């Protein structure tokens, strides 16, 4: 198992290129199951979750060819089975995204429940209700979702009680081959969903209301779609993370290959804290702040402040003057990084879903443990400003969603080494 060793308080300067968005790539990879013709997907990030989804597609019978490290050609013309097994699904919760396309195209599928998933307690029930609204029969048998619609799916209204990004994506993909019109009410509005809509539209699916909370889909009454090649949008969370690298180290950094309006909640907050930003068409440059002020954040669905940036801003709060407050409204157990930041010297108190951070605090290098993907990046941010050497363990979480993070940070002047645990 690998860990990162980070020398703190090293000056940073330069630019970084943002990779394709993992959270856009995953549903688009799943959507290729709807296509009867070959599709080329460009700007795929080389991260563990993408490799896991590619392996799942291959296991279902899709033929895959990597044309270069970030371009994949996929043909799902002759899939030979429709069972997504536990061995593959347990590696990644987003594997549930194959449910909608498999059911829509083949009228029956078996998809393992994602690991540790209790029906009712986790959002998987939103996916199942959406499929049932389109006429599917759903049974849970021996840890598998058995879904079937012998006469095909039929368009209907799908109302999400709670906004769900992957739930919206699964419903969109299923509706694309359903007979008639489907309305998704209380749909998620993330840019990743907008790109999935564009991909489905390239195959002839009519979708109204793209980017809004109500989507109207007229299904294509064929056995499959003819999807076109696509380039994955830049990763707004990776971009936000590198903006935080600049912010926490108070460095001048340029973040390239981005879509600035996808980052507005993040850039607005950085300006409020005291940073100057030069926002161009596809880049943002962050300049050192004379004074970094404490702030308040409440996580919300897009276009609100993203829950996936909450951990990074908690690390940043340790270097801001005054008391910062972060309220997490979307997920439980999303403050697991707080106790690890405390090991570095952060002054953080927790009360249910609210974290209070007192700053500015001098952090000291230590051994810390990543608990999830975004927590791992928060610990790296804190280690960059800590006095001495820090070691971040369990970075397999990091590798799920950040492409070559240590290479990109080292190119800015940092001293980060990937080493093997003894």
UniProtKB/Swiss-Prot annotation:
Protein name (record): UDP-N-acetylglucosamine 1-carboxyvinyltransferase
Protein's job: Cell wall formation. Adds enolpyruvyl to UDP-N-acetylglucosamine.
User: GO biological process: what's one of them?
Assistant: cell division
Sequence similarity? Belongs to the EPSP synthase family. MurA subfamily.
What's its catalytic activity?
A: phosphoenolpyruvate + UDP-N-acetyl-alpha-D-glucosamine = UDP-N-acetyl-3-O-(1-carboxyvinyl)-alpha-D-glucosamine + phosphate
Which parts of the sequence bind UDP-N-acetyl-alpha-D-glucosamine?
Answer: 93, 122-126, 308, 330
**Residues that bear 2-(S-cysteinyl)pyruvic acid O-phosphothioketal:** 117
Q: Keyword Cell cycle on this protein?
A: yes
The opening ranks of the lineage are: Bacteria, Pseudomonadati, Campylobacterota, Epsilonproteobacteria, Campylobacterales
Which residues does UniProt assign to the signal peptide?
Answer: none
| A GO term from the CC aspect | cytoplasm
Looking at the record's lineage, which domain of life comes first? Bacteria
Q: Which GO terms describe its molecular function?
A: UDP-N-acetylglucosamine 1-carboxyvinyltransferase activity
- Enzyme Commission number(s): 2.5.1.7
Gene name tied to this protein: murA
For this protein, the record's HAMAP family field holds: MurA
Q: In which pathway does it act?
A: Cell wall biogenesis; peptidoglycan biosynthesis
């Amino acid at each position: 198992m690998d860990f990162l060793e980070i020398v703190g308080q090293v000056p940073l300067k330069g630019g970084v290129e943002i990779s394709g968005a993992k959270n856009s790539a995953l549903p688009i990879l799943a959507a290729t199951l709807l296509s009867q013709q070959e599709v080329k997907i460009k700007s795929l990030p080389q991260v563990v979750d993408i490799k896991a989804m590619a392996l799942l597609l291959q296991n279902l019978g899709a033929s895959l060819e990597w044309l270069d490290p970030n371009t994949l050609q996929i043909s799902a013309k002759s899939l030979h089975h429709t069972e997504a097994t536990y061995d593959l699904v347990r590696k990644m919760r987003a594997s549930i995204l194959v449910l909608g396309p498999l059911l829509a195209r083949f009228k029956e599928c078996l998809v393992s429940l994602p690991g540790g998933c209790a029906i009712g307690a986790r959002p998987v029930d939103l996916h199942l209700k959406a499929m049932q609204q389109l006429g599917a029969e759903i049974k849970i048998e021996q840890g598998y979702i058995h879904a079937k619609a012998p006469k095909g799916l039929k368009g209907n209204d799908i109302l999400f009680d709670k906004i769900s990004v992957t739930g919206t994506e699964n419903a969109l993909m299923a509706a694309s081959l359903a007979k008639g019109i489907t309305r998704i009410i209380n749909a998620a509005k993330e840019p990743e969903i907008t790109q999935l809509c564009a991909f489905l539209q390239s195959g002839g699916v009519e979708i109204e209301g793209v980017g809004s909370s109500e989507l109207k889909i007229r299904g294509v009454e064929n056995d499959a779609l003819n999807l076109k090649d696509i380039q994955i949008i830049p990763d707004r969370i990776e971009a936000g993370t590198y903006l935080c690298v600049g912010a926490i180290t108070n460095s001048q950094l340029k973040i390239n290959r981005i879509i600035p309006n996808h980052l507005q909640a993040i850039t607005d907050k950085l300006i409020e804290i005291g940073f100057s930003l030069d926002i161009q068409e596809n880049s943002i440059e962050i300049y050192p702040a004379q004074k970094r002020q404490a702030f308040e954040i409440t996580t919300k669905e897009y276009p609100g402040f993203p829950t996936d940036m909450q951990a990074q801003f908690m690390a940043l709060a340790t270097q801001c003057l005054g008391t910062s407050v972060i309220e997490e409204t979307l997920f439980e157990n999303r403050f697991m990084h707080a106790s690890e930041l405390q090991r570095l010297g952060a002054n953080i108190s927790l009360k249910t879903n609210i974290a209070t951070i007192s700053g500015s605090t001098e952090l000291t290098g230590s051994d810390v443990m990543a608990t999830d993907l975004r927590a791992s990046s928060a610990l790296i941010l804190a280690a960059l400003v800590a006095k001495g050497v820090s070691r971040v363990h369990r970075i397999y979480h990091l590798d799920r969603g950040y492409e070559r993070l240590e290479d990109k940070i080292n190119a800015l002047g940092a001293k980060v080494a990937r080493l093997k645990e003894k």
